[in-house]
Structure formats: structure tokens, C-alpha cells
Amino acid sequence: IEWVEDRLVGDVAPMAGEETALRLQEMDLFQGRKDETIADLEGRMKQRAVKAGAAIYSIGDQDQELYLIRRGEVRIMAPISGSRQLHHIATFGRGDFFGGLAFLDERARGDNAIAHTDIDLFVLSLDQFNQLAEDHKKLAFLLITAISRTLAQRLRHADGERTLLQV
């Protein structure tokens, strides 16, 4: 499965040097939002550049941050069935987000996020999100709904893969 995913991502992703970093309003989560709302949100986010191979977060980290990928790819690695060995779980690219579980449930990270290529990120902390929600309730609701739906889709996909592997 990982081999197929790598081939598919490689077929559609531009070369790392050619890829431009997305602006916030270009991301699917925020299309159609008012310019002033986007500007307020962007002012609350950090921007972070991470070199290929570097950890973005690790198992056990207590941060409650949501990461939005402006450019590049990140691989999610996690132990399976109590093993200490990490397995590739997913790859996310330009326009995707990751880190949603710890952002929503405020628990420690259960996986590692590793930059597969050099990446640029928008980072939204839970504290900043809560402040944003006071001023932009509709945007906060839409963001939480989008995160929840995406996580549900990813869980269904992972459950389907697990079922296939058991056959």
C-alpha cells in the first residue's frame, strides 16, 4: 500500500523546488471566506519551515496544534499492535492538514510527524483557535466541522485498509 501511495503522490506532486507555498485563502478549508477573516486567522497562526527528515512532533508531545501544509510532504509514523517499531500510516501534502486529533481532544500525540520533503506550514494552536472562535464563530464552527469530517474519512479509509490486511 505504501509503495502505491508513493507512486501516486509522485505522479501528481510537482518537484519540490517547483512547488509554491499556498496562501491561507488558497486552502480548501478557507476558500470563500472574507479577506478580513482570513487576515485575522493568519495573524493568529505561526509559520514554520521544516527541513526534510526533521520531526514536526513526536509520540507523547503535549502540544495542541493543527498543522496546515503550505508546501511539501509530511509522513505520519506510528507503532502498530503494541510494537515499538514505527510504521508509515499516511502521507499528507500541499493543502492538507495533520495533527487534528491532539488539537481536538487535547491529549498527547500518538504518532510521529516527519517532514518527507522540505515543508512550509501554518500552525494554529488551540489557544489561538479559542480566541479566534470568540470573534469568528462561523469560521470556527466550519473549521471544526471540516476537521471532524476529514478525520472521519481518514478513519474509515484506515479501517478499510486494516480489513484488507486481515484477509
Model regions: which residues?
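Glycine- and acidic-residue-biased ligand/ion/polar-headgroup-sensing regions
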Residues: 53, 64-81, 93-96
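Cyclic-nucleotide recognition modules
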Residues: 87-145
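Polybasic "coupling" helices that flank or enter modular domains
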Residues: 145-167
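Short phosphate-coordinating micro-motif centered on Lys-Gly-acidic
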Residues: 56-61
